[in-house]
């Protein structure tokens, strides 16, 4: 995710990551993909539970928030429980985007994500992209904070 943000010209990225081992393995086995992120001083990594970490973040700090949880119901419930904190740190006019899974494989989960975003922000848009490593079209739900 950080690599894609850098490729789109983001000036500063705060990356909240639970598992340092996953990142180390990605850097080791996928150096072409991860090398740019590792070498970039515009990416600040916060280790640990993201939802705990954002409790300390000042209000309206972020223009964009990307939520990259698994697409199972537990993670949707976890996001729902923490949506107030996510809204608090998103600037007015900012956009929150969540990877919501594959519509053809898990339509109920996508519906639940979309309802969660709609109920909290009053708007939601579903987009998709082909992810080669997932071998399917992957969906993303986005809402703007008005």
For each predicted feature, which ranges?
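Acidic carboxylate-rich catalytic motifs and surrounding loops in phosphoryl-/glycosyl-chemistry enzymes
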Residues: 101-102, 128-132
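Glycine-rich, charged/polar anion/phosphate-binding loops
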Residues: 51, 125-129
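Core SAM-dependent methyltransferase catalytic element
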Residues: 120-122, 132-146
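The AdoMet/dcAdoMet-binding core of the Class I SAM-like
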Residues: 1-114, 118-120, 136
């Amino acid at each position: 995710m950080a690599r894609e943000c850098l490729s789109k010209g983001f000036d500063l990225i705060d990356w909240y990551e639970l598992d340092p081992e996953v990142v180390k393995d990605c850097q080791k086995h996928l150096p072409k993909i991860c090398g740019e992120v590792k070498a970039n001083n515009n990416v600040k990594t916060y280790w640990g539970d993201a939802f705990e970490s954002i409790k300390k973040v000042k209000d309206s700090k972020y223009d964009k928030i990307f939520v990259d949880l698994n697409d199972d119901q537990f993670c949707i419930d976890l996001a729902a429980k923490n949506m107030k904190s996510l809204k608090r740190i998103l600037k007015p006019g900012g956009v929150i985007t969540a990877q919501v899974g594959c519509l053809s494989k898990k339509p109920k989960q996508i519906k639940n994500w979309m309802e969660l975003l709609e109920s909290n922000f009053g708007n939601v848009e579903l987009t998709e992209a082909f992810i080669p490593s997932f071998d399917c079209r992957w969906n993303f739900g986005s809402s703007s904070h008005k």
